[in-house]
Amino acid sequence: MMNAIPVKPTGTRWTDNQWKSIYAKGQDILVAAAAGSGKTAVLVERIIQRIIRDEIDVDKLLVVTFTNASAREMKQRVDQRIQEASIENPDNAHLKNQRVKIHQAQISTLHSFCLKLIQQHYDVLDIDPNFRTSSEAENILLLEQTIDEVLERHYDILDPHFIDLTEQLSSDRNDDQLRNTIKEMYYFSVANPNPLNWLQHLSTPYEDESQQETLFNLLNDLAMIFMNSALEALNKSYDLFMMLEEVDKQVAVLDKERRFLAEAMEGGLLNTQKIAEHQFESRFPAKNKKIKEANEMMIDAYDDGKKHYDDYKALVSKVQEDYFSREAADLKTDMQRLAPRVAYLAQVTADVIEQFNQKKRSRNLLDFSDYEHFALRILMDSNGNPSEIADMYRKQFEEILVDEYQDTNRVQEKIIACIKRGDEADGNLFMVGDVKQSIYKFRQADPSLFIGKYNRFTLDGSEHGMRIDLSQNFRSREEVLTTTNYLFKHMMDEAVGEIVYDDAAQLYYGAPFDHKPHDVQLNMLIEDASSDLNGSEQEAEYIVQQVEKIMSQHEIYDIKTEQYRKPSYKDIVILERSYGQARKIQQAFKDHNIPFHVNSKEGYFEQTEVQLILSFLRTIDNPLQDIYLVGLMRSVIYQFTEDELSNIRVFSPNDDYFYQSIKHYMANDVANKKLVAKLASFLEDIEQYQDYSQSHPVYQLIDKFYNDHYVIQYFSGIIGGKGRRANLYGLFNKAVEFENSSFRGLYQFIRFIDELIERGKDFGEENIVGPNDDVVRMMTIHSSKGLEFPFVIYSGLSRKFRRDDLHRPVILNQSYGLGMAYYDVESNLSYPSLSSVTYKAIAEKEMVSEEMRLIYVALTRAKEQLFLIGRVKDEKTLSQFEQVSVSESHLPVSYRITAQRPIDMIYPILAKYQSSSLPNELRFEQTIEDVDQAMRPYVQLNTDFYEDIASETVTDVSEQRTVADIEMNHSKNEALQAQIHNQLSYEYPYQSAIEKPSKQSVSELKRQHETEQSDTNYDRVRQYRIGSTSYERPAFLSRSKQRKANEIGTLMHTVMQHLPFNKDRLTEEDVNRLVDHLIAQHIIPEDAKQDIRFDDIYNFIASDLYQLIAESDEIYRELPFVVNQNEVDHNKHSEEDASIIQGMIDLIFVKEGQYYFVDYKTDAFNRRRNMSDEEIGAQLRERYKVQMNHYRNTLETILKTDVKGFLYFFKFGQLSIEG
């Protein structure tokens, strides 16, 4: 039963839910702590209050953290708070005792707690108390050795089921696939409380028809997601083609597909036979002549209809290929055939577990998995119930507090369950975590444990346990939070993401930043196919440019001083999913002389200096390995040239090994004497090192090679010397660590290295950069978890998700078991089984869910500003993103499951919000009002072409040409001039069809209206419109001191765009500071001050309109729009081709639900003698009547509500615009 929570005093820094998290007790409590919500501070404060307020000894609390570093930090924080409390209450004996007991406090990782448990109760386990923890190298080699021996034993027995298994999972060359499968099954099984029991039940679904039926229903539900999307796409296609004429062939194809879907989906259960046998038309009928010559709207309708058909076809094909390439009966039949193989594979893995454990016991070794399983053996009796020792710990610990609970696995959950008190309704377990940041499934973390409690527990604690949501974020600016919220509102739900992103899950702004806008930047790079750089290299250059912009144009707000400062390189971090592109990014920063560091866990073995030493070690172990032998000879140590190596090979081209060729060359009388001497010296070296390796450990062999050839000195003296030296010492230290294990010798060390390389597990380059070094850092999203940075560049959004696990021969799932295809030994063909297709479908959904959570972690690292970097091959891809359909306020489930990259989800969501031209069915919301303030994204979508970026860094040769050069060139190209003249003089035969423009700005409509009233020919207006296009002024003109009127107008609009609206009005000093800031940020030119009309701005600040805006509820600036003119004119049924109206509204504000727009005018006008203000106002209203009407009608069309407006003339004042 929940105990009373003390009343929160006024003025406390804790939020209501933080306060509740600190003091609630009496039942199990789950704190769902969103990113940046201060969970660590809350956890420490809870511990302190349990000690001070409840007078619980600190050693009566068990605090479990995810890492040793977190445990150390938490213990230090608790110790510091106890000291502070002791100083405040010097006579408090309880606090004095805690100063002593803090050193025995159980604040540690669960592994550390398990280790202590084993050390205290080793007698229960019947193990030697002098055990030691195995090293990584030792564990890897010992497991490899165990698998070798177990497989050898089964090869001797040659059971028929084992033969079938090896036929399925081995190749003609080796059984690596079988070995890797056994290893994966080993790691999966030991993540369960009872590994052997888990293995034993793997074959049950293959034998039990009721479980097979359950699997089929699960697969049917997953496939139905795609079939429903296919039905929707087909209906859209059908509706569009039914609008067109002379498309009978196309409609016939669609009718056939509609009949197929009706039969395949009848009754809600998919007809797998129909799906498996269905064949599409080989080609969709092409457009006929009439369609090709139809108007643009009809052609667009045809193209859209064809696209929907293609989408339909892709969705059904997905179901055919991945789910039901065979009908249900066949899928189930092969399950029965697979049962013996699965059972035998499970038995082989069980044999590996048993023998691996025996090997570890004989060496008196324990690994981290043993920690957990031995702890369970201590805490559970033979019946699986808590033991007497577990009861003892239940009585000892008043409360168990678990940090990062979302990363718990099933074994750890069982350990905690053994030592906690009571049930969920009256327990003493306090858990903190965020399932949206559960990104360690590859370590067997099980987010379903968190999700289960999240769904069971209630906010009032009336049933089961209590759930408390910490949603207020104290890390990031509002723009980061609201944009993240908006993305995940439309991206994450129970279907994909495994949790609903609702009001409870979203982030709420709580940091004391100022209100200067810091929009999230979504920067899309369009690749240049003609560039010498590939797409990844172009993106690396794009990232460098972004860093340069941050350094030159941005500032950082210091919350403590409430002042801005210039950024340093260390304020910038680049986050990527992996280190796959780290080398290219590193090279780009090197090319631009920007300090950069990547503490990569990948690429260590690819470093030149490391490859040299590994080639040396492999050659000493076995010189009959050509790649390593030749690599060593060509290295800087021995410096054999390619000509020398080719001469050696030419002498004996038929030798199997290059080592033999060396011997034969040296024995040849006509060989080059100088080269023979060089080879003799080299072989003498090799033989000496081989002799040395027989009697010395590996690390001494490496050390001798370093000293003999001055390896450290050489690599220290070249570019990147500090890092290279660290890498060489790192390899030496690994050799020392290896020799301290139970394995010895050069061969075993090389095998250890090979296993690491094969598993993709690098040592990582040695870290030579400290936290205060001023460098741009690159790290993976995983390594950034728990950290925060002022500027985050989240790049690599266009790189594909890792789907390797979906293509493994065996797919494992903690909840469902093992899925594998059926291999027919006789026909040498493989067929999908019910388990293989179902588990693959589940794995695909879980994979995308984890990738979503990685995106969430990346976005929420940013404090000041977030930059998203994507890359596409052409603009068409971006347009296609906008056309992605919408389903129940989300991207369709089928679309999300099959998403290939982060950008596939991020761009469509943000682009749809930004676009004002999409039809309603492609939008998430119809109006701005539909978006809650906490969900409203503040984002700028920027599209850049790499060719433009590249040109910025290349000197423009044309600037160096003289007038004489141009004149000379002009005289030499008369033929070319004639050709150009003919092309430019070409007259379009269908000129009348384009007299009406397809797109017009509001200003153009205004000019058209004015010319119609004055009988001006429309051709003249059109000519004027084209001729008045504004181009950037050339460099020699832009140096002119005097700006033109239109340039001053643009300058004034820019200042007004950034002008703050304060209720107590800005001072002249405030305006001057604003202008200085705009100049410093390169938003306006340095010489702008001389042309800014400050008096006009001061007058505006003093106006009633300024005050009205300042007191409004919401303000939006510089809003672009593109709308259909027929919709604005309420003429939707017009058969005429509609024009598109585009424009930019200076400002919109909302006050008490009423929308207003404001249009600033810098126009000069003549005040005639004796004209009153009313007459001038009427004249100005008339002049801008058309433009303002279009603004108002456009906004009313978009917002679906009444809109009023104001014209503000800097030389006159405000004029209201109403309907």
Swiss-Prot record:
HAMAP family: AddA. Its cofactor is Mg(2+). GO terms for molecular function: 3'-5' DNA helicase activity; 3'-5' exonuclease activity; ATP binding; ATP hydrolysis activity; double-stranded DNA binding. Keywords: ATP-binding, DNA damage, DNA repair, DNA-binding, Exonuclease, Helicase, Hydrolase, Isomerase, Nuclease, Nucleotide-binding. It catalyses: Couples ATP hydrolysis with the unwinding of duplex DNA by translocating in the 3'-5' direction; ATP + H2O = ADP + phosphate + H(+). This is ATP-dependent helicase/nuclease subunit A. The heterodimer acts as both an ATP-dependent DNA helicase and an ATP-dependent, dual-direction single-stranded exonuclease. Recognizes the chi site generating a DNA molecule suitable for the initiation of homologous recombination. The AddA nuclease domain is required for chi fragment generation; this subunit has the helicase and 3' -> 5' nuclease activities. ATP binds at residues 33-40. GO terms for cellular component: cytosol; DNA helicase complex. SUPFAM superfamilies: P-loop containing nucleoside triphosphate hydrolases, Restriction endonuclease-like. GO terms for biological process: double-strand break repair via homologous recombination. NCBIfam families: addA_Gpos (TIGR02785). Residues 997-1016 are annotated as: Disordered. It holds the Pfam family PDDEXK_1. Residues 12-477 form the UvrD-like helicase ATP-binding domain. Residues 1004-1016 have a biased composition (Basic and acidic residues). Its EC number is 3.1.-.-, 5.6.2.4. Heterodimer of AddA and AddB/RexB. Disulfide bonds: none annotated. Belongs to the helicase family. AddA subfamily. Residues 478-786 form the UvrD-like helicase C-terminal domain.
